[in-house]
A protein has these predicted regions:
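C-terminal, loop-rich substrate-recognition/catalytic regions characterized by aromatic stacking residues
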Residues: 44, 306-354, 479-514
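Substrate-access "cap/lid" subdomains that shape
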Residues: 181, 215, 224-338, 367-386
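Mobile gating loops/cap/lid regions near enzyme active sites that modulate substrate access
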Residues: 35, 69, 378-514
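Serine-hydrolase-like catalytic core of hydrolytic proteins
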Residues: 72-254, 300-323
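Short, solvent-exposed loop/turn segments at secondary-structure junctions
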Residues: 37-38, 146-147, 228, 317-320, ...
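Active-site rim elements
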Residues: 78-80, 161-166, 228-233, 289, ...
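Alpha/beta-hydrolase fold catalytic core
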Residues: 347-390, 395-401
Length: 514
């Protein structure tokens, strides 16, 4: 296939509120990378970024520094891209079909990695080209501050640090303001913005709903694997952690932490934080409830100002549990062997009690998949959907498709992302003979429909009503996509204690990197 490319000194060129930017045109898309939407001093609120000359927006910008250097991990399952890191990371990328006045729906991607890792380009599947080109949408992805740079409460040390515990969230809002003010020049509709994200990115969507400063900046939300109680808010003062850092670094005052080299700051944090965290102290790295962010809606009420915003919320069958299924080769197991494996993992009494419920909820799955049903995501997501359905429209989905890798593996955390972006061609393990093309189109079209209308219904899937407080109307996406109301309610209630205990032995939430 022949590709087309163009990039001249003055085209494609867009004048933004910060200054002019020049991108490039590739295969029918105008692409802009690394556009600064803000700048900020360490621990302080973001301010608008401005420049005088035309900004070259043809390559990705810096990503936020991490507390530990990333290393390749599970690349066959979740292919990664590693990039240059710097604290000047407030930048965004745009893919658009044309620089016109078409007012296309806008999708703003919030990356995963909890609140302490990841970037807008960390995963190969995050690329926005296919979504923009095939879906006729404007796609935006953003970088923002993370970890102690973005979520470290120093409010005890003065008003200038009042919201340091949510500086990363403040960056996201600055990016959404930039989108509101500029996206029309890129062919997008500032009145039709969907924020969507997976894992930590999905959690950031739920956080925005609880943040008054975000009101009016987005109109729909997609939460993918983003409701997980073990990534809870940071409550209490961050003073103890800050004082421990100052002592470790020999810093005279809190202002000195603003200028110490990041590598030294991160090393000191990694040294002092574990003991403080074990003692129940606030060590940052997740949002800090205050007047800016009003807290987890499962612990507090949904804000009435955002209670009617349409949401699409769901999880993946195996999430993190599925990463433990290496070499199982379940395709070669007999039914008796599969049940024996479940008994080995969960104990015979527990397996005997759960398997009938499991087969009723997931008849297409082997009994060997039961230990890999990730209830730590599914159960809080079910609660979130029920609570949200009391106030506004919410649709439930569940990614249920087995993969052929290693003799058959339940879907894992992030395995749905290539389907959402129509990027399975970039992720070899996502290609399932006879399944992927149709499944990818079903999921992709649901996202496109939701971004346009606030309803994921389209002609390629069964009728999909919104959920109610009494009935979770879940669309199970797999080779035989179907609507499954309350399909696993009894199973999750029964399985939660046993599978949670199994996961607790095998999964450390602080290890999340996707």
């Amino acid at each position: 296939m022949a590709h087309t490319f163009s990039c001249s000194a003055d085209a494609p060129l867009v004048r933004t509120t910060g200054g002019s930017v020049r991108g490039y045109r590739f295969d029918g898309l105008d692409i802009f990378k690394g556009i600064p939407y803000a700048k900020a001093r360490r621990f302080h609120a973001p301010e608008p970024a401005v420049w005088d000359s035309v900004l070259d927006a043809t390559s990705y910008g810096y990503v936020c520094p991490l507390l530990e250097m990333p290393k390749p991990n599970g690349e066959m399952l979740v292919p990664h891209r590693y990039w240059l890191m710097d604290e000047a990371c407030q930048n965004l990328n745009i893919w658009t079909p044309a620089l016109d006045d078409a007012h296309r729906p806008v999708l703003v991607w919030l990356h995963g990695g909890g609140y302490f890792a990841g970037s807008s380009i960390e995963q190969i599947a995050y690329e926005g080209e296919n979504m923009a080109r095939l879906g006729d949408r404007v796609v935006v992805s953003i970088n923002h501050r993370l970890n102690i740079l973005g979520y470290f409460d120093l409010s005890d040390f003065g008003a200038e640090y009042a919201n340091s515990g949510n500086a990363g969230g403040d960056d996201i809002i600055a990016a959404l303001r930039w989108v509101r003010d500029n996206i029309a020049a890129f062919g997008g509709d500032p009145g039709n913005v969907t924020v969507f994200g997976q894992s930590g990115g999905g959690a950031k969507v739920t956080t925005l709903l609880q943040t008054p400063a975000a009101d009016g900046l987005f109109h729909k939300g997609i939460v993918m694997s983003g409701v997980l109680g073990r990534l809870a808010d940071c409550t209490g003062s961050g003073r103890d952690c800050a004082e421990a850092l100052m002592a470790e670094l020999g810093a005279a005052d809190i202002a000195a932490l603003e200028t110490v080299p990041y590598a030294a700051l991160a090393a000191a944090y990694n040294k002092v934080a574990p003991a403080l965290k074990a003692a129940g102290k606030n060590t940052g790295c997740t949002p800090h409830p205050n007047a800016f962010y009003l807290g987890d809606p499962l612990e507090n009420a949904f804000r009435p100002e955002t209670a009617r915003i349409p949401l699409l919320v769901g999880t993946v069958f195996g999430e993190f549990a599925a990463f433990n299924g290496f070499g199982l080769n379940k395709a070669q197991m007999s039914a008796a062997e599969a049940e024996g494996f479940a008994e080995k993992m969960l104990g015979k009494q527990t397996a005997d009690a759960l398997l009938p419920l499991f087969h009723a909820a997931y008849p297409e799955h082997s009994a060997a998949d039961l230990p890999f049903l990730d209830v730590l995501f599914r159960e809080p997501t079910m609660r979130y959907i029920r609570r949200r359905a009391e106030t506004g429209p919410v649709w439930s989905y569940f990614f249920n498709q087995d993969f052929t890798i290693e003799g058959g593996r339940a879907p894992w955390h992030c395995s749905d992302i290539p389907f959402v972006f129509h990027n399975t061609e970039l992720v070899p393990s996502a290609n399932i003979s006879g399944v992927t093309p149709q499944l990818e189109q079903q999921i992709f079209d649901a996202v496109l429909a939701f971004a346009r209308t606030g309803n994921p219904q389209h002609s390629g899937i069964p009728t999909w009503p919104a959920s109610t407080p009494q009935q979770e109307n879940t669309m199970l996406f797999d080779s035989a996509t179907r609507l499954a109301p309350n399909h696993d309610k009894a199973l999750i209630a029964a399985a939660l204690p046993a599978i949670s205990a199994l996961m607790a032995r095998n999964f450390d939430p602080d290890s999340i990197q996707h």
